[in-house]
Amino acid sequence: MMNFRQRMGWIGVGLYLLASAAAFYYVFEINETYNKLALEHIQQHPQEPQEGTTWTHSLKVRLLSLPFWLWTIIFLIPYLQMFLFLYSCTRADPKTVGYCIIPICLAVICNRHQTFVKASNQISRLQLIDT
């Protein structure tokens, strides 16, 4: 039997995937516009910076020149982290919620490593008594 947290987790996962599908449709629908802007940016001849250019225009030009794989990584990591967090809310054990988020996962791994080192140091301090 699922509890309330698990039900809300599955509803969250469903809504998140639905919103993702809508966002992907929107992105690929405007992909043609992005390609046109990128081609215009490439076809322009290098010019001296004009005095009237604003910082927003120069920022837009620099961001458009970033490669596609970098944009993918920038958006994919937070997307997957949010999805994995929502998915972890569907687990039966409430103690495992959030373990798949990278900072929490690293903290748990480091804590386990420190605990293992402490335990092995305590074992090595024990002396065997030979009878």
From Swiss-Prot:
Keywords: Golgi apparatus, Membrane, Transmembrane, Transmembrane helix. One of its GO terms (cellular component) is Golgi apparatus. It is found in: Golgi apparatus membrane. This is Lysosomal enzyme trafficking factor. GO terms for biological process: lysosome organization; regulation of vesicle-mediated transport. The lineage of its organism: Eukaryota, Metazoa, Chordata, Craniata, Vertebrata. Required for mannose-6-phosphate-dependent trafficking of lysosomal enzymes. LYSET bridges GlcNAc-1-phosphate transferase (GNPTAB), to the membrane-bound transcription factor site-1 protease (MBTPS1), thus allowing proteolytic activation of the GNPTAB. GNPTAB is involved in the regulation of M6P-dependent Golgi-to-lysosome trafficking of lysosomal enzymes. LYSET is thus an essential factor for maturation and delivery of lysosomal hydrolases. It is a multi-pass membrane protein. The chain crosses the membrane at residues 8-28, 66-86. Belongs to the LYSET family. InterPro entries: LYSET.
